Amino acid sequence: MSDGTLVFPTQFIDSTRVPNAGIMYSKDRGKTWKMHNMARTNTTEAQVVETEPGVLMLNMRDNRGGSRAVAITKDLGKTWTEHPSSRKALQEPVCMASLIHVEAKDNVLDKDILLFSNPNTTRGRNHITIKASLDGGLTWLPEHQLMLDEGEGLGI
């Protein structure tokens, strides 16, 4: 994070054998780690980015199928709120995806950008696509998408 906090996505199985995504973090350069609450039940294979100082977005494989779940925390996972795009904006066939945040100072548009890649379909692992969001993940417009491969694949 911009304040030096180390953060990475996690998943754990609860007592009913349902997977849950969340985050772990360290404020002491990795000497100790803490974890608070899950972001959403029945989710795995998450990606985490800091969208603005102190605000983390967790983008998760949702085992219910059809689309990605997305949640926001401003307190390192103590509380989570569902992002407006959750289960709406990013279709997928229930598989791993990638998400990165590119700061305005590091790109030619001079805007913060989220880059996301996954199979852009609800069936099969094909149509591997990179998408860009210029509004914090609210929209992923077709003109900001690049299909890399139409064929079947095992991963991204």
Question: Which residue ranges define each predicted feature?
Answer:
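Asp-box/BNR beta-propeller blade signature and adjacent active/binding-site loops
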Residues: 1-156
